[in-house]
């Protein structure tokens, strides 16, 4: 999913959206290994939080006003914070390795920095 030119014509061209999709894939792969009793609990919540990140970026991109776009980027940031907390919980419950936790948190940190920078550009 790499851009072929420097032009951004839709949300798929945004690096922040692409990284968000990577977070979704990593979250789904990670939660596959969770205990069965978490299917409708932590696994489901983590997946919803992860999916919310690129979804809100895409929705915001297609809004007509920068204020609306920025609002949805803030929602995506909130979803990042939710997922960060859920990763901590999953780690405390020994549902993931320290390496997996570290990798996910590093990607989330990068995503949050990119989202904050995009909000600054819109304001």
Spell out what each predicted region is.
Residues 1-123:
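Amphipathic alpha-helical assembly/interaction segments
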């Amino acid at each position: 999913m790499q851009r072929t030119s420097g032009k951004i014509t839709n949300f798929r061209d945004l690096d922040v959206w692409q990284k968000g999709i990577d977070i979704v894939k990593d979250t789904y792969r990670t939660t596959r290994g969770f205990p069965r009793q978490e299917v409708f609990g932590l696994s489901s919540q983590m997946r919803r939080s992860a999916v919310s990140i690129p979804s809100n970026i895409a929705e915001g991109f297609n809004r007509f006003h920068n204020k609306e776009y920025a609002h949805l980027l803030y929602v995506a940031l909130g979803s990042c914070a939710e997922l960060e907390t859920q990763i901590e919980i999953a780690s405390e419950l020994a549902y993931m390795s320290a390496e997996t936790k570290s990798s996910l948190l590093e990607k989330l940190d990068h995503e949050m920095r990119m989202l904050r920078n995009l909000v600054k550009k819109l304001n």
